[in-house]
Amino acid sequence: MVKICCIGAGYVGGPTMAVIALKCPSVEVAVVDISVPRINAWNSDQLPIYEPGLDDVVKQCRGKNLFFSTDVEKHVREADIVFVSVNTPTKTRGLGAGKAADLTYWESAARMIADVSVSDKIVVEKSTVPVKTAEAIEKILTHNSKGIKFQILSNPEFLAEGTAIEDLFMPDRVLIGGRETTEGFAAVKALKDIYAQWVPEERILTTNLWSAELSKLAANAFLAQRISSVNAMSALCEATGANVSEVSYAVGKDSRIGPKFLNSSVGFGGSCFQKDILNLVYICECNGLPEVAEYWKQVIKINDYQKTRFVNRIVSSMFNTVSNKKIAVLGFAFKKDTGDTRETPAIDVCKGLLGDKARLSIYDPQVTEEQIQRDLTMNKFDWDHPLHLQPMSPTTVKQVSVAWDAYTATKDAHGICILTEWDEFKKLDFQRIFENMQKPAFVFDGRNVVDADKLREIGFIVYSIGKPLDQWLKDMPALA
């Protein structure tokens, strides 16, 4: 029986290994992590991450050929294939701080693999890593190998949170990069045979190591670039009276462009886009390509501009002050169908409003009060480091309360900000909400989820990103 071990029980490792276990009943899969609470959650009915369909997959396999354990060394020692799915956060200090990936966790995982291994192994990069990481890992493994042979593969994930299980069941492609040697080709084939049990062969792509590593960074950069492109257009649409939804629909009808990732919003979030682009920028700078680095930096700059623009619009619309005004924030996760708040635009929007002394009442169906308070007291890149390294404010943010439903959050509010496109926000009784709000009542739709015309009929003043402005908003121009 082939034994697989995955180091890291997070958003990538957990779902990926669960699906491999489901699709390959003859393979034994162990997911290991040093976090006891996280492994306990994976072994309970309350999984540590929310992902549609994940519960069912885990329940079908757990205890049969899928195991979650804190005994990292035992499972690594026994495995034929070791996936490494640990965090590669942005460095917070030292060389490359604020841009370069921090490979501390990767290096310690590699040293541990070399230390405990008693048989040859295939080591698979699953985390997003800078180009040439495999080379560094290879050196660590080789210099500590005690005669054991390791083959390094790059197998980046292309999951989208919220549709991860669907993406794993029917991937656009599976990418496997390896060394162009006899041993390298054999290692690629071994991993390919696992995926081939449910993925059509034409969707399994094989490349050299460096192409696979760079492909992941490039894919995320291209996706983020599309979002920043349409968000840049949304600012122009507001200035000219065009409608960004109509513009993006027309543009997306061009078969060379396509309709995906053309929805304007308050900005992109999630654990990957900003981190990977900053990493790409750093790699370009290190390779003497400042013009290329500058090009990719603009994607982040537009994203930051969009969030700033949104906050400025809120403040200017509400008589240029939100001091001591209650603002309801609907949605805190970076997108719907996930509880993930990493790099969510909601953090910067909320901090911007708090900086203007607003009182916030936040509701998100999947994000806990503890998580919201932690996010709002954290420094820029600390979110991706272990909890014990994250600075905690001695007190919670006083001007922030967390509500259990949208109606409580919006009661007596002066304005509503919609920051996540949860389906339930489309079905709210806005007449009831309007009656319980201060007047004039504002809705700032950061995801273009509500029917602005219907809300205006009720009596709301509505701002939708990239849409023609209400007369009220035209009379109160926002600073860009």
Curated annotation (Swiss-Prot):
Q: Which residues bind substrate?
A: 157-161, 216-223, 256-269, 334-335, 447
Query: Any idea which GO molecular function terms this record carries?
Result: NAD binding; UDP-glucose 6-dehydrogenase activity
Recite the UniProt keywords alphabetically: NAD, Oxidoreductase
Q: Which residues bind NAD(+)?
A: 8-13, 33, 38, 86-90, 127-128, 161, 272-275, 342
Alphabetized InterPro entries for the sequence: 6-PGluconate_DH-like_C_sf, NAD(P)-bd_dom_sf, UDP-Glc/GDP-Man, UDP-Glc/GDP-Man_DH_C, UDP-Glc/GDP-Man_DH_C_sf, UDP-Glc/GDP-Man_DH_dimer, UDP-Glc/GDP-Man_DH_N, UDPglc_DH_euk
Effect of deleting the gene: No visible phenotype. Displays smaller nematode-induced syncytia. Ugd2 and ugd3 double mutant displays a strong dwarf phenotype and often develops seedlings with severe root defects; cell walls have an altered sugar composition. Ugd2 and ugd3 double mutant displays abnormal nematode-induced syncytia.
Task: Describe how its activity is regulated.
Answer: Inhibited by UDP-xylose.
Which GO terms are recorded in the biological process aspect for this UniProt protein? carbohydrate metabolic process; cell wall pectin metabolic process; UDP-glucuronate biosynthetic process
Q: Which reaction does it catalyse?
A: UDP-alpha-D-glucose + 2 NAD(+) + H2O = UDP-alpha-D-glucuronate + 2 NADH + 3 H(+)
Q: Which residues form the signal peptide?
A: none
Can you tell me which residues form the catalytic site?
Answer: C272 (nucleophile)
Pathway, per Swiss-Prot/TrEMBL? Nucleotide-sugar biosynthesis; UDP-alpha-D-glucuronate biosynthesis; UDP-alpha-D-glucuronate from UDP-alpha-D-glucose: step 1/1
Q: Which GO terms describe its cellular component?
A: plant-type cell wall
The record's EC number reads 1.1.1.22
Q: Which family does it belong to?
A: Belongs to the UDP-glucose/GDP-mannose dehydrogenase family.
Q: What does this protein do?
A: Involved in the biosynthesis of UDP-glucuronic acid (UDP-GlcA), providing nucleotide sugars for cell-wall polymers. Required for the formation of cell wall ingrowths on the outer cell walls of nematode-induced syncytia.
Protein name, as recorded: UDP-glucose 6-dehydrogenase 3
